Amino acid sequence: MERNVETFLGCDKEFDEARIVIFGAPFDSTTSYRPGTRFASRTMRAESYGLETYSPYQDLDLEDAAVFDGGDLELCFGDTNKALADITAFTEEVMQAGKLPLMIGGEHLVTLGAVRSVAAHYCHTSDCT
């Protein structure tokens, strides 16, 4: 997996050393009223450079965390089912590699793709239904 050029909060670790994988889901095909949520992940990355990464309360710096930024998924605009399937597949790929997925950006519906994957990965009994 290749690292994104513009990373979130300087999360520039390599995939193999990362514990968390950030990825964007730029999609807004079912947004009503005002589209534009597809630009959220790119904007979040750009604006994150103005944030302080060090927490004096925790005495930790986010730049020291093992986080890989995989960039944005290339989602098919206008094909909601395909976009959700792509998000589900990528989230599963991240979890199969033993890493935690962290999706940013996109409309509310994109969460469904990630939740489907997480549920399939962790719910092996009827307790999850």
Label every model-predicted segment.
Residues 1-128:
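Metal-dependent C-N hydrolase catalytic cores
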